Amino acid sequence: MPKRIAVLVTNNFDDQEYLEPVEALRAAQHTICNIELRAGKVVYGLHGGLAVTIDRSIEQISIDDFDALLIPGGESPLALAHDVRVLHFIQAFNQARKTIFSLCDASLLLSEADVLKNRMITSIRAHALRVQYAGATYYDAELVNDNNQLISSRVPNDLPIFIHECLNVLKS
């Protein structure tokens, strides 16, 4: 059964960490909704070649609208980490025990949202201490699946296993 996936993204997202999972999710018939602070805004990847139009603003949505949340890495997560509406959305998503897919720097946004206590996660090694201070157990691994609720990977090279796991989790 197709699922509804929110993709939380703003300018300077990692192009590959956005494009590859989104293409795979769409190919599996899942619905993608790009969310940010302003609907209709066009945001660009770090490498400038990928433009993404925001479908709905964070204020136009409810966690009930979605089955999972994808947060690509790059500079996008840090740019969003200072907006209380974004943090509240992530907190509500976490409290509802809905699946969060986290790539690379997305761990910093999850840390800022204070949803990592007693969780297992991977991210780039540079963020290991930060997620541990937020209460998570850090693993330096291609993929960490914490009870099908938090699926995380480190870097673009981990995308094949990450995407495979995302698709498997959405089947359950």
Where are these regions (language model features)?
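Extended, subdomain-level signal for the structured scaffold at the beginning of enzyme domains
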Residues: M1-I100, L108-M120, A128-S172
